């Protein structure tokens, strides 16, 4: 029941967040092609600074971060921190915690990463300017895809939601590795050394029982700055930070229950005035609050705290500054990169996830989970083509300001591929899932 309830809560949040993300992306595209386009571009290139004496936190290579750089390299680190926390949780106690659980989604995710890259390379050959975007169609947007799946409500088997979540998490791991390995340059190892020392410090402090999330986040900001200067993409700092945040609570559940029972048994009874609590009652309630805080691990607590900020602030801002596709202007609006990305997300993801899942089950390597069948897997495989967030992120890393025409084509490919995959995935699942009685 706990798993089912948490999936329901998560799905409800994802529906709202997905709608907000979609609306924000549409707004960005409309503004980018309106008379206000120049204002939009000025907003993206507006320089920011955060000075402490003569030190500017928001600077890199001698210049201030622009708004789009701050959102992509700064705020998106919060998103990747949350992704890292989700990955760590899944590896410890979730669907990736054992070979039996992880095998099918891992194999499906591998197919969902390999085949899109192959299809992309067939359209835009490696070694060409367009070939730099090979990794763009690899990603699956967890929140967006689960949001679409959740529109089907109780008709969706829990196993199907878990399968989609698990292979999307593996996709994220793949995307993070690609960013770390292929989109880093001119590494300044002295900055990385200082960052590594701070990670080690946080790890041992966590082992000693420290649970103050603010402390971990403040040190995380310092590490983020060191990564920003190092040449390794700064968002990776958030992922690594997640793995040094303690996953073990200060109180185990058994001790917590005993403590709460003891507090309740000694809770002062209400007097004649039953509106205002007595000081003794307030003290007991604070004991309950303190115990409740200590039974939730820093990892779970921080993940819960970040969901709202990421879904309703960070990702909408990211969509707004990155989804402003130009439908007119210099160069081809629709080109080879557009086709490569869209086909990679729509056809590549479907073929990769479905075929690798089929091979894994038919070979006897892993059983088909209860509640899943080849029809509903086909729908979820299509939803895997909802790349959006990480795909747009990798598109910016692939082409950036050096190739604005190709970047615009890539963005159009991501948006069109994501929309088509979402619509087709929803329609297929609507047809094949059991009708609500």
Swiss-Prot record:
PANTHER family: NA(+)_H(+) ANTIPORTER NHAA, SODIUM ION/PROTON ANTIPORTER NHAA-RELATED
MF terms in GO: sodium:proton antiporter activity
Role of this protein: Na(+)/H(+) antiporter that extrudes sodium in exchange for external protons.
InterPro entries documented for this protein: Na/H_antiporter_dom_sf, NhaA
Protein name per its UniProtKB record: Na(+)/H(+) antiporter NhaA
Record organism: Bacteroides fragilis (strain ATCC 25285 / DSM 2151 / CCUG 4856 / JCM 11019 / LMG 10263 / NCTC 9343 / Onslow / VPI 2553 / EN-2)
Spans through the membrane: 12-32, 65-85, 103-123, 133-153, 162-182, 186-206, 214-234, 308-328, 333-353, 377-397, 412-432
Subcellular localization: Cell inner membrane
Annotated membrane topology: Multi-pass membrane protein
């Amino acid at each position: 029941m706990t798993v089912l309830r948490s999936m329901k809560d998560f799905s409800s949040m994802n529906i709202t967040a997905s709608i907000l993300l979609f609306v924000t992306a549409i707004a960005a595209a409309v503004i980018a092609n309106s008379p206000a386009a120049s204002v939009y571009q000025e907003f993206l290139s507006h320089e920011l600074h955060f000075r402490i004496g003569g030190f500017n936190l928001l600077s890199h290579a001698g210049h201030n971060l622009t708004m789009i750089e701050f959102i992509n390299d700064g705020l998106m680190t919060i998103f990747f921190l949350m992704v890292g926390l989700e990955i760590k949780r899944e590896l410890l106690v979730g669907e990736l915690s054992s070979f039996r659980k992880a095998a099918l989604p891992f194999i499906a995710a591998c197919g969902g990463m390999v085949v899109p890259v192959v299809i992309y390379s067939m359209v835009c050959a490696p070694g060409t300017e367009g070939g730099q975007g090979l990794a763009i169609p690899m990603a699956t947007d967890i929140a967006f895809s689960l949001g679409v799946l959740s529109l089907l409500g109780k008709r969706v088997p829990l196993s199907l939601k878990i399968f989609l979540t698990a292979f999307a998490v593996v996709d994220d791991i793949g995307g993070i590795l690609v960013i770390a390995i292929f989109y880093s340059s001119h590494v300044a190892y002295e900055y990385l050394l200082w960052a590594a020392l701070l990670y080690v410090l946080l790890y041992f402090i966590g082992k000693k029982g420290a649970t103050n999330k603010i402390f971990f986040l403040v040190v995380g900001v310092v590490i983020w700055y060191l990564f920003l200067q190092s040449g390794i993409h700064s968002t990776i700092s958030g992922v690594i930070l997640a793995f040094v945040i303690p996953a073990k609570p200060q109180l185990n559940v058994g001790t917590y229950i005993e403590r709460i029972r003891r507090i309740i048994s000694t809770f002062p009874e209400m007097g004649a005035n039953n509106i205002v609590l007595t000081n003794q009652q307030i003290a007991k309630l604070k004991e309950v609050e303190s115990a409740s805080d200590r039974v939730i691990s820093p990892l779970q607590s921080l993940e819960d705290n970040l969901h709202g900020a990421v879904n309703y602030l960070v990702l909408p801002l990211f969509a707004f500054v990155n989804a402003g596709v130009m439908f007119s202007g210099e160069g081809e609006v629709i080109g080879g990169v557009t086709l490569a990305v869209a086909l990679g997300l729509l056809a590549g993801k479907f073929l990769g996830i479905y075929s690798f899942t089929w091979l894994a089950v038919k070979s006897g390597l892993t059983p088909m989970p209860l509640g899943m069948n080849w029809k509903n897997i086909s729908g979820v495989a299509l939803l895997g083509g909802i790349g959006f967030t990480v795909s747009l992120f990798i598109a910016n890393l692939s082409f950036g300001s050096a190739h604005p025409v190709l970047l615009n084509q890539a963005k159009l490919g991501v948006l069109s591929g994501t929309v088509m995959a979402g619509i087709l995935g929803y329609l297929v699942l609507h047809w094949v899932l059991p009708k609500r009685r």
